[in-house]
Amino acid sequence: IAAVKKAKAQGLKIPVVYNTSGYERVETLKNLEGIVDVYLPDFKYTDTTYAKRYSNAPDYFDVTKAALAEMVRQHPAPQFTDKQEAAVRGIEEGIMTGGVIVRHLMLPGLLKDTKAVIRYLYETYGDSIYISIMNQYTPMPFVENIPELNRKVTHREYDKAVDYAIGLGVVNGFIQEGGTAKESFIPEFSGEGLE
């Protein structure tokens, strides 16, 4: 936090993006107020059964819901650089400089919960957030004992989720096309080099 504050005081012009699981304490987020420009949280489930089974977090929905509310309190509407601000900042026009983009990674077989996540986000926040519906789930070897997760999301499942979002009226959204469910999209989490 101190480094970002110092960089901003010295003229940092690019937006600070906080990439988070979404499972955050509100107190932590309050400490980031005025530091983070764009929040990029995940919102995985509404159903506590899935949250407990796949994330060992039966309180996932309540914790993430409260965290997201705090993020939106800090950034109640998306902001983008216009031509003048882009010139001043030395960055491209149309770059998000404030706001919240909520990512939902669709899991195989959980279309009903994906729809519940999209419905909750849109009914609660409307166009004040962006919703990114992701289809890049890639089954890794450690899920071979969880049969329902041991496959990719089908095109049909994903298309139904996207159609559902469009039917609700979601316009501030992102979708994925093409072959995004590959191991090459997964960063290495070996912890090498960390102390």
Predicted region positions:
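Glycine-rich S-adenosyl-L-methionine
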Residues: 57-76
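Short low-complexity, flexible loop/linker segments enriched in glycine and/or proline
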Residues: 33, 55-58, 187-192
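Conserved radical SAM core fold
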Residues: 22-26, 43-61, 100-102, 107-108, ...
